[in-house]
Amino acid sequence: MRGVVLMSKLTSPVFEYVIPEGLPPGGTFTQNLEMVADTTAEYAPFNVLTVDNFSTKTVKVLYGAGHFVRLRGNSMVEIAQNGIRSFSVVNSDSEATDGIIVAYVQKRVTAEIALEAIARKIPVERLMGGE
């Protein structure tokens, strides 16, 4: 009897997470993108994380395996990296956030990913973190 091989999807819709204002100093918002009860699980892992900080406070965005960026107030960052399975936003300021913070995740096949898969002669699914 052959085993069943489950493959994650190559592309996904954009999933949006709104972090309300008032995240206390040192407070953390964490989103696990592989929760079975959530529709994001069938698309995980993701390869694009965009965070739009509408607050005037500085936050730290953690993603992947120990990677992070600091994001000043009223600014945005787009992170493109394979294997994003969760992310956290930490208020690294001394005061609570005074505006919302919006995070978007998506899985998409970029030209770079397609070219790398061709050059390395490996399936795009494997390169993007699928099994």
What residues fall within each predicted segment?
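Hydrophobic loop/turn residues within beta-sheet-rich immunoglobulin-like superfamily modules
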Residues: F54, Q81-N82, S92
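Short, surface-exposed beta-strand/strand-loop-strand elements in extracellular ectodomains
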Residues: P45-V48, D52-R70, A96-Q106
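Short, solvent-exposed S/T- and G/P-enriched segments that are highly enriched in secreted/extracellular
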Residues: S12-I19, L23-T39, G64-A80
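Solvent-exposed, low-complexity, repeat-rich "mucin-like" stalks and linkers
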Residues: Q31-N53
